Amino acid sequence: MKPIKKLEGKTVAIVGMGRSWFDYNLAKSHGVHFDEVWAINAVADVIFHDRIFMLDPASRFFDSEDAGGQTESMKKILKTHEGPIYTCELDERAPGLVLFPIDEVVRDLNCYYLNNTVAYAIA
């Protein structure tokens, strides 16, 4: 995955379901502009976004209830979203999936530990 040249010097909001959710909405309500918005998992179902980072396999949502309250939202997103949805494995049921280039990221950043989906998005 090459760096996204059009984003050099731009502002990106990475929005998950924790504190970033509140910070993002507060910023937007005060007129802050973001050049791109990256949604983490099911946040993509409730905000405008340019990209989704979902480092779970799509089968977690299609084939189980392991994601709890996120399951139905993610099924809907995965079936219809054109992408990119960065993930750890492709699934023919989800047309917008793009493999996250973990080997390239680890090599280029010389970083061998990413502990959550936000860390993957930042990398």
Task: Identify the role of each PLM range.
Residues 14-16:
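Short beta-strand segments
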Residues 1-2:
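N-terminal pre-catalytic "stem/leader" segment of glycosyltransferase-like enzymes
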